[in-house]
Swiss-Prot record:
GO terms for molecular function: phosphorelay response regulator activity; transcription cis-regulatory region binding. Residues 3-116 form the Response regulatory domain. The keyword Transferase does not apply. SMART domains: REC, Trans_reg_C. This is Heme response regulator HssR. Phosphorylated by HssS. It is found in: Cytoplasm.
Length: 224
């Protein structure tokens, strides 16, 4: 089941969103502040966060930046601030979507599901290739009795490659699929993620490897 973190200093909004999420079979974890949300994340995995901007202490912009950079969690801003400058700052902070108050909770749920689809978190599927099992629900890799949890983007990148063995993916294709077509960062971030994945696969003694195809991109090979 999808785990959704909702952060807002208004308890009425927290209860309102949580009750509707639960009817849609989405687990809701409500927190009144950015600091409380980060404390929760020390012990609880979530798939997506809905974040207010105007909060005491850590505001929504700061929280969004931390969620994206430290936890790699997709974020939807939910706020009464509708100025273009606020939206610009939110997207610079890393938000995946922006919803203004007052809002229709059904629309918020539509947007949550749309962002989850973009991140491929809407499925509980497992995939096994060689001696490696990938659990998409928990972002876990397993080889024999060894289990490893990955950051979201690393897992989705590996899952995409493993789902199409021997197909070559260019950096541009990977960025569009994993980071989104509007990503403005350095495409070399793909190389960094690939390097980390190779290290993790080696540590697990997986038979799956990620190969570089010179001048083209990356593909996976299973050595059994």
């Amino acid at each position: 089941m999808v785990q959704c973190l909702v952060v807002d200093d208004d308890p009425r909004i927290l209860n309102y969103i949580a009750s509707h999420l639960q009817t849609e079979h989405i687990d809701a974890y409500t927190q009144p502040s950015g600091e409380a949300a980060l404390k929760l994340l020390e012990k609880q995995r979530v798939d997506i966060a809905v974040v207010d901007i105007m909060m005491d202490g850590m505001d929504g912009f700061q929280l969004c930046n931390t969620l994206k950079n430290d936890y790699d969690i997709p974020v939807i801003m939910l706020t009464a601030r509708d100025a273009l400058s606020d939206k610009e700052r939110a997207f610079i902070s890393g938000t995946d979507d922006y919803v203004t108050k007052p809002f229709e909770v059904k629309e918020l749920i539509f947007r949550i599901r749309a962002v989850l689809r973009r991140y491929n978190i809407n499925s509980n599927s497992e995939m096994t290739i060689g001696n490696l099992t990938l659990n998409q629900s928990y972002l876990e890799l397993q080889v024999s009795n060894k289990t490893m949890t990955l950051p979201n983007k690393e897992f989705q990148l590996l899952f995409m490659l493993a789902a199409r063995p021997k197909q070559i993916f260019t950096r541009e294709q990977i960025i569009e699929k994993i980071w989104g077509y509007d990503y403005e960062g350095d495409e070399r971030t793909v190389d960094v993620h690939i390097k980390r994945l190779r290290q993790r696969l080696k540590k697990l003694n997986a038979t799956l490897t990620i190969e570089t195809v010179r001048g083209q991109g990356y593909k996976v090979e299973n050595h059994v």
